[in-house]
């Protein structure tokens, strides 16, 4: 089973990593190609392209300028520890053991606009480049054109080595589209997290994002390599609801939040 996550806009490079193990992203050559193109943009260009405030645009202008190879623990950080925000708050990777992270390295993949696909312990330098950005490049009009075939090949190669090829999609549609817009050779299971509000169950973005991280953590600490074990997921009061689920969409609900 492969578990897909989105990256995060918020980054944490202040907290020292609690593990020394690291790996290198598989597509640094392609990342460098994108960085070279991004360096041609002014802060105003970046603000317009990514709909950022002037301070955020300047921050990322400087990030692109400072991005450099090779990646080392001195100038980069493991992806799962660098990404912050709702999903990663739920995952709480800073509290995972080295053995947990080793298991996550086999099961979890983070889709990225700059790095393509990341393993949790792959080193990354700070950046902002969402997969949905309409950033024209030699491959086409956007990052889906740039990454699509590469991601599909990488994912299918991993799935081909599994006795039961299955993807648990905990990434957003923006990121999953980069891979699933084409054909993944395996089952795809999409968890849906709903909370009770105003007399009915509904998806509440903040809670749903955090639940994606919680489910990833549940899979990691319980060493789940098959999706069926996730039906027992009960973190933060969520429970699987079979009567509103089907083979592809697994619904988890909670009454109180």
From Swiss-Prot:
Any one biological process term the GO annotation gives: response to hydroperoxide
Pfam families: H2O2_YaaD (PF03883)
Regions crossing the membrane: none
Lineage top rank: taxon: Bacteria
CC per GO annotation: cytosol
InterPro entries: YaaA (IPR005583)
Family: Belongs to the UPF0246 family.
Name of this chain's protein: UPF0246 protein Daro_2893
Species the sequence originates in: Dechloromonas aromatica (strain RCB)
Origin organism lineage: Bacteria, Pseudomonadati, Pseudomonadota, Betaproteobacteria, Rhodocyclales
């Amino acid at each position: 089973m492969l578990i897909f996550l989105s990256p995060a806009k918020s980054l944490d490079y202040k907290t020292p990593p609690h593990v020394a193990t690291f790996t290198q992203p598989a597509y640094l050559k392609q990342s460098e190609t994108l960085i070279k193109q991004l360096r041609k943009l002014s802060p105003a260009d970046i603000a317009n392209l990514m709909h950022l405030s002037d301070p955020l645009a300047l921050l990322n202008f400087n990030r692109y300028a400072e991005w450099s190879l090779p990646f080392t623990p001195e100038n980069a950080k493991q992806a799962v520890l660098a990404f912050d925000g709702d999903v990663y708050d739920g995952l709480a990777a800073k509290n995972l053991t080295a053995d947990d992270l080793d298991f996550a390295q086999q099961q979890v993949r983070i889709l990225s606009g700059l790095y393509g696909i990341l393993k949790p312990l792959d080193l990354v330098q700070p950046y902002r480049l969402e997969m949905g950005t309409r950033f024209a490049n030699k491959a086409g009009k956007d990052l889906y054109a740039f990454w699509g075939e590469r991601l599909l090949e990488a994912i299918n190669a991993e799935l081909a080595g599994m006795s039961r090829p299955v993807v648990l999609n905990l990434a957003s549609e923006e990121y999953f589209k980069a891979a699933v817009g084409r054909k993944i050779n395996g089952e795809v299971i999409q968890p849906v997290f709903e909370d009770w509000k105003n007399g009915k169950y509904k998806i509440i973005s903040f809670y749903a994002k955090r639940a994606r991280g919680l489910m990833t953590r549940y899979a990691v600490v319980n060493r789940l390599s098959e999706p069926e074990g996730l039906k027992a997921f009960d973190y933060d009061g969520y429970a699987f609801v079979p009567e509103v689920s089907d083979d592809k969409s697994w619904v988890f609900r909670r009454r109180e939040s």
